[in-house]
A protein has these predicted regions:
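Short, compositionally biased
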Residues: 119-130, 174
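C-terminal cap/linker of serine protease catalytic domains
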Residues: 1-18, 84-87, 158-227
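Conserved active-site neighborhood of the chymotrypsin/trypsin-like protease fold
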Residues: 35-117, 132-135, 144, 191-207
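Short beta->alpha transition motifs characteristic of CBS
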Residues: 42-47, 110, 119, 144, ...
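Small-residue-enriched segments and motifs
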Residues: 30, 52, 62-65, 121, ...
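A residue-level detector for short acidic-glycine micro-motifs
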Residues: 34, 66-68, 110, 125-126, ...
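Catalytic nucleophile loop of clan PA
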Residues: 142-162
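A conserved glycine-rich beta-strand in the N-terminal activation segment of trypsin-fold
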Residues: 16-38, 42, 60-63, 90, ...
Length: 227
């Protein structure tokens, strides 16, 4: 969907991450939306992978499978299936339902390298490419591998998900709005009654210094690997 003439997806091909996964040929980012092992990433990432692993900030790899994908918003839900994964009781952040204000500061975490990378910027437009109302335009430095990474505001709320960037315009990046996650779950419930995903509602990052927010968030942002 986002491989248009003026855009490119932000997954990274052909770069071998440091991982126990055998010869992965693609790398992106995802983050937990439920401590039982449910993550959000991009649909364009999931669609090109037959085998998917996710890696946490401790270097632990876990097998994951797609639960649901929505190509219209370029979002997908993954489920960690490895028995070695230990559920996390409570995530310290929440997912924002409402839109951001223009010029609101944001930051993102992702895996353009073999270690997590921080970037900061601001909301530059309330819509995405060609007026897409399901996305934002943000000004922030991202690189291949950032695709699927969380966009957060100063209160530590998830406000978006990195999807693509303009090839010929430095710093012009698009992010799916976090409200799409709620719509995604509604669709999942209609198709998979047995799934129980509880979105986080924590406020543990609010009021923290940015360095402390990032330290806490690192545990919940994963590298997405696969072939």
């Amino acid at each position: 969907k986002v491989d248009g003439i003026s855009q490119k997806v932000l997954g990274e091909q052909g770069i071998p991450p440091v991982s126990t996964v055998t010869d992965p040929d693609y790398r992106a980012t995802g983050f937990l939306i439920d401590g039982k092992g449910y993550l959000v990433t991009n649909a364009h990432v999931v669609n090109r992978l037959k085998t998917i692993f996710v890696e946490n900030n401790k270097g632990e790899d876990f097998r994951a499978v797609p639960v649901y994908t929505d190509n219209n918003t370029d979002l997908a839900i993954l489920k960690i299936t490895d028995e070695s994964f230990k559920a996390i009781p409570a995530l310290p952040y929440s997912i924002r339902r409402n839109n951001l204000d223009l010029a609101e500061p944001i930051f993102t975490l992702g895996f353009p390298r073999n270690e997590i990378v921080y970037g900061e910027g601001y909301l530059s437009a309330k819509s995405g490419n060609s007026g897409d109302s399901t996305a934002y335009q943000v000004t922030v430095s991202v690189n291949p591998g950032n695709s699927g990474g969380p966009v957060m505001n100063r209160n530590g709320e998830i406000v978006g998900i990195i999807t693509s960037k303009e090839k010929n315009a430095d710093g012009v990046v698009y992010a799916a709005k976090s409200a799409n996650i709620f719509k995604l779950l509604d669709a999942v419930k209609k198709s998979e009654d047995s799934l129980s995903i509880k979105l986080p509602s924590g406020s543990g990052l609010k009021g923290m210094e940015r360095t402390q927010q990032v330290k806490k968030m690192e545990e919940y942002v994963f590298m997405v690997l696969g072939n």
